[in-house]
Structure formats: structure tokens, C-alpha cells
């Protein structure tokens, strides 16, 4: 098996387990057993559990960003492309493996002084705000740059709330309500 295939299998296995069970609740031995590899193989690819956590966060984020970009672009130009982020979340919520936000789950489990993981999560969240800003600029022309920044942050906060509350309540009404609220604020 190629090195990249092995590394990808380790990342995919760790991603599944970290997201399902939590970062702290998932041990290295569990990842090794699930991936069907030797301990030395894991440590040839990742020097620590923290390095594997970074790969997990990056894997989840890359998959998410690609998916949401394709999905939003498939919608008609205008408000629909912006509101589509909530429809995308609704589809994600319907997945039997939905377990909330991988970033928030992870940051809640790490020590406050773990700047490596915290910085990666902040970067991902800021990149999502940038994606929302781009959606606004590409689809709505009546906002100034300053207004776009503020609006993107507001939509981001609505989205994050919808993720957390839909997970908590195990229902999609938070997604529907935040989409309705977003529709009102982008008019």
C-alpha cells in the first residue's frame, strides 16, 4: 500500500473516531486497531496525537469547504446562494453521523494554552467567514465593504448557532429558523 493511502486511511479513521467519540475519548490504540496498522506506522506519519488532530481538523474542513462551495454555486445567483449554506447544513444534519461542529467539539476538549490546535480552528472559522463574505459580494451589490464584513460575521454566528442547537435538540428547527432570520437580515 502506498504511503499516501496509509496516511489517508489513518486520517479518515481518526476523523471518524474523533468526531464520533471526541478527541480525548479516542485513544491512539483505538485508531491503530480501526485503521488496521502498526503503532510504528501511525508514528511514521504523525509524530503525536496533536499532529493527528491537526490532520483531522484540516481533513474535515477541506471536505466541508469543498462541499459547501459546490452546493452554493449550484443555486441561482442572489439570496439563494447565501441561504444555501443553511440548506447544506440541513443535509449535513440529516446524515446519521451528524454530531455537531468538529471544531467546537475539539476546542472544548483541549487545554486553553494549546495554541497549535486553537489557531487552526480559528483559521478555519475565519476562512468560513471569508467564504460567506465572498458569497455576499458575489450575490448582493447593495452593501459596502464594512457592511459585508459585519453581515458575514452575523451570518456566521447564525450558522454556528444552528449547528450547535440542531445537535443539542436533535432537530432541524434551529436550521430552518436561522435560515429565516438570515433571509430577513440580507434584504
Predicted regions and their residues:
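Amphipathic alpha-helical segments used for helix-helix packing
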Residues: 95-115
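Hydrophobic alpha-helical connector segments
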Residues: 55, 69-95, 151-155
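Amphipathic alpha-helical packing segments from all-alpha helical-bundle domains
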Residues: 80, 114-139
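A secondary-structure capping/hinge motif
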Residues: 50-52, 106
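Hydrophobic/aromatic-rich alpha-helical bundle segments in the mid-to-C-terminal region
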Residues: 117-124, 139-184
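Short, basic, alpha-helical segments at the C-terminal edge of helix-turn-helix-like DNA-binding modules
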Residues: 58-65
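Short hydrophobic/aromatic patch on the recognition helix
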Residues: 36-46
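Basic, helix-initiating cap at the start of DNA-binding domains
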Residues: 1-21, 25-37, 51
